[in-house]
Amino acid sequence: MLGRIAAIFGAVFSVWIVSADEPIMNMMPRWKGGWGVQTIFEHRTERDLLLDGRIANKGFSEEVNILHLEGVYTWDKAIRLTAKLPYVINARREMPEDLGGTQRDKGIGDLTLALPLKKYFNLDGRSGSWSFKPMLRVPLSGEDEYEVYDDEWGTGLGLSYEFETYRFILFLGTSGWIYHEDEPFESHSSLDLGYKFEAFDTNGAILWETDFHFEDDGSRTLLAGPALYWNIDDLKHLRIEWKHDFQDRQGVLDHGNGDTFKLSIGWVF
């Protein structure tokens, strides 16, 4: 038990580099009674089957397409409720024949509920917030040939710090999850750096985002890439991102060495 507690605090406080993203675009709405919805199309490909730090089966790939539906309601500037529900459009992975061969998954994933609590600050030349986020994972994914989502109850905590100046954005976030059955403890941490711009009576930001995923079965993945956020007209918001696995180690036989593309559209009211 003490080892598990140490792993949790070690991952949460020593890996400050998100899954930490919340609707809408991790930014809005900030006003009392505000709400919004966001859809995200995610396409992920992984090229090899890994074990520890080596390729166990080269060319055994996995391809996943997911549609995420997310919503947020702001009771008060400092208190929000968020919900995230993924739907696996199609997923396909290649395994050795003695481990199932080609397998597929499709359907609803697990629901994630969160209660982000924020403390805002305004300083000379910059403004931002600290966030503390309790989270709950609700199992909704059914049985298939294999499961993209865990189909287990889970509880988590998230911490983040963010600020922006007239031109620049910084976001630091980390979250940790404990599952109630067989899944290992996992954490997701993020470091995002951005440059804000105005063009054609709109505004947005160009970002470089670095993520680190850790599981206490020995799995570690470092991925990074560019993102573009565009505030179209205050009501509609667009985001495009791409990330590449620069370092991937799997503690159990699993796919890795991949790329992830996401296209997000959000509406704020």
Which residues does each PLM region occupy?
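Transmembrane beta-barrel domains of Gram-negative outer membranes and organellar outer membranes
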Residues: 20-172, 176-179, 188-219, 223-230, ...
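Cleavable N-terminal export/targeting peptides
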Residues: 1-28
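Active-site rim beta-loop-alpha module in soluble metabolic enzymes
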Residues: 182
